């Protein structure tokens, strides 16, 4: 029987209290690369969440049968298989988004969040709790991605999901798009500001000297 309190903890904890990007500072590279548009940030969130959840589930199912000496290889094989499935589905049903995400879907296998949860949680916990932990961490990762993607697309081009929200001066509107938001360094600074804001609200997350 799944532990309801544990499921609630692993599902909701990563959203704010133990966010994989804001607190653990994991998965930052892809957060910089795929957040120029809200659409790609959302698709990447779904992809990482599915891979993390199902890899946790399958690894947890066979955790008692994996020799310690090859556990990392087994984990990577399971994660890589799921990444290939996600990549092929995107190419089949969302080809344009797949092209925009480029190699970053394939690089989910190297995402520290996916490997970290497999090793730290799935290898020690039952399947249902592990699955929910994967969903929680995927959503925690996604919250930051979506916020960054929202800000970058809105202020960088005046659009959301490719739809004009703030008409640019060139098209007779009032808004002057800020191209700096479309450059990778802007994502770095936005994530830094989000981390600062979160740790201001939750002082317990600040590391002691």
Swiss-Prot record:
Identify the GO cellular component terms for this protein: plasma membrane
The top EC class, named as a word, is translocase
Q: Name one GO molecular function term.
A: oxidoreductase activity, acting on NAD(P)H, quinone or similar compound as acceptor
EC numbers, comma separated: 7.2.1.1
Please give the catalytic activity noted in the UniProt record.
a ubiquinone + n Na(+)(in) + NADH + H(+) = a ubiquinol + n Na(+)(out) + NAD(+)
TM helices/strands, residue ranges: 42-62, 66-86, 103-123, 131-151, 178-198
Q: What is its main location?
A: membrane
- Specify the protein's topology with respect to the membrane: Multi-pass membrane protein
Q: Which InterPro entries does the annotation name?
A: NqrD (IPR011292), NqrDE/RnfAE (IPR003667)
What are the entry keywords? Answer: Cell inner membrane, Cell membrane, Ion transport, Membrane, NAD, Sodium, Sodium transport, Translocase, Transmembrane, Transmembrane helix, Transport, Ubiquinone
As for subcellular location, the record says: Cell inner membrane
Task: Give one GO biological process term.
Answer: sodium ion transport
UniProt function note: NQR complex catalyzes the reduction of ubiquinone-1 to ubiquinol by two successive reactions, coupled with the transport of Na(+) ions from the cytoplasm to the periplasm. NqrA to NqrE are probably involved in the second step, the conversion of ubisemiquinone to ubiquinol.
Family under the similarity heading: Belongs to the NqrDE/RnfAE family.
Supply the HAMAP family for this chain: NqrD
Quaternary structure? Composed of six subunits; NqrA, NqrB, NqrC, NqrD, NqrE and NqrF.
This protein is called Na(+)-translocating NADH-quinone reductase subunit D
Species per Swiss-Prot/TrEMBL record:
Proteus mirabilis (strain HI4320)
């Amino acid at each position: 029987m799944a532990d309801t309190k544990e499921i609630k903890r692993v599902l909701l904890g990563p959203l704010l209290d133990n966010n994989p990007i804001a607190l653990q500072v994991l998965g930052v590279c892809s957060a910089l690369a795929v957040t120029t548009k809200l659409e790609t940030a959302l698709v990447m969130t779904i992809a990482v969440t599915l891979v993390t959840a199902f890899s946790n589930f399958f690894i947890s199912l066979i955790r008692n049968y994996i020799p310690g000496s090859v556990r990392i290889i087994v984990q990577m094989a399971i994660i890589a298989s799921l990444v290939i499935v996600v990549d092929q589905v995107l190419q089949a049903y969302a080809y344009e988004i797949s092209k925009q995400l480029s190699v970053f879907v394939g690089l989910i296998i190297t995402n520290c969040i996916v490997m970290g949860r497999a090793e730290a949680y799935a290898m020690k916990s039952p399947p249902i709790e592990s699955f929910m932990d994967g969903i929680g961490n995927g959503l925690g990762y996604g919250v930051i991605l979506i916020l960054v993607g929202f800000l970058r697309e809105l202020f960088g081009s005046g659009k959301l999901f490719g739809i004009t929200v703030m008409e640019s001066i060139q098209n007779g509107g009032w808004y002057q798009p800020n191209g700096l938001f479309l450059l990778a360094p802007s994502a770095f600074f936005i994530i830094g500001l989000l981390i600062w804001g979160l740790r201001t609200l939750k002082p317990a997350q600040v590391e002691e000297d």
